[in-house]
Amino acid sequence: MMIKNKKKLLFLCLLVILIATAYISFVTGTIKLSFNDLFTKFTTGSNEAVDSIIDLRLPRILIALMVGAMLAVSGALLQAALQNPLAEANIIGVSSGALIMRALCMLFIPQLYFYLPLLSFIGGLIPFLIIILLHSKFRFNAVSMILVGVALFVLLNGVLEILTQNPLMKIPQGLTMKIWSDVYILAVSALLGLILTLLLSPKLNLLNLDDIQARSIGFNIDRYRWLTGLLAVFLASATVAIVGQLAFLGIIVHVVRKLVGGNYRVLIPFSTVIGAWLLLVADLLGRVIQPPLEIPANAILMIVGGPMLIYLICQSQRNRI
């Protein structure tokens, strides 16, 4: 009971930190906002300067929150489905496949913009299915699976590089220049994906069982591995449709697991909040380090995530010895 109360208190503290960070991000920028500016806006409803800043910053903040949460949860689901603590949508090529499909859809069927998350999901499925098929045949260990994923990532990014030589082929570049329609599109995918994840979370702990143990209790482990993997790909692909590729947010789950343990009923909510906070901080730092220039949030995530991935690979190899 005491441990549960501590986790609840920690979760509330993280929520407060997330809200505080969102407020700081909202009032910070080339044009700063004061509390009085916001108070005047919400009491009188008339402040054109604040209105313009709201339309610039608030969609960006909301998208950062949703994308961070979705990618962190996607990482947790992928790791559960593949039984690999190194799995992450960007590393295994899922994001690259989704981005290629997104680019092709915008070139040939731009009128389906609202359906981009679903269409990108189809592209993200291809590298995921390749990983699954190869793993079923060769039984990769954790590091070998990631190496195959990196090879797919490089291959698909090469294809993407060729496609983007076409001046009409536009791909999203991070969190900049986001508008309210992007928020609405992503919100639908976020609500659907995260609600399904919460419904699925009681079964995720059972994915750690081997096939014999699962069958002995009547648990269809193959079905739930597929459902979990598909949901992970959907969450990651939906974010790619709006912001493009963001690296390493999925492996933050390893840190969350150290904090709260491996119970997915607890791990998923904590990953949601910490993932949202991490991307929001990365975006905020990118805006304030060298104004008026902006450092992409993805660059900051790569600087932090690269050493973390090296550490996880070394730890995985040490555990095999």
Swiss-Prot record:
The keyword Transport applies. GO terms for biological process: siderophore-dependent iron import into cell. Disulfide bonds: none annotated. InterPro entries: ABC_BtuC-like, ABC_transptr_permease_BtuC. SUPFAM superfamilies: ABC transporter involved in vitamin B12 uptake, BtuC. Its main location: membrane. Keywords: Cell membrane, Iron, Membrane, Transmembrane, Transmembrane helix, Transport. It is found in: Cell membrane. This is Probable heme-iron transport system permease protein IsdF. The chain crosses the membrane at residues 9-29, 61-81, 89-109, 114-134, 143-163, 179-199, 233-253, 267-287, 294-314. Induction: Repressed by fur in the presence of iron. It comes from the Bacteria. GO terms for cellular component: plasma membrane. It is a multi-pass membrane protein. GO terms for molecular function: transmembrane transporter activity. Belongs to the binding-protein-dependent transport system permease family. FecCD subfamily. Part of the binding-protein-dependent transport system for heme-iron. Responsible for the translocation of the substrate across the membrane.
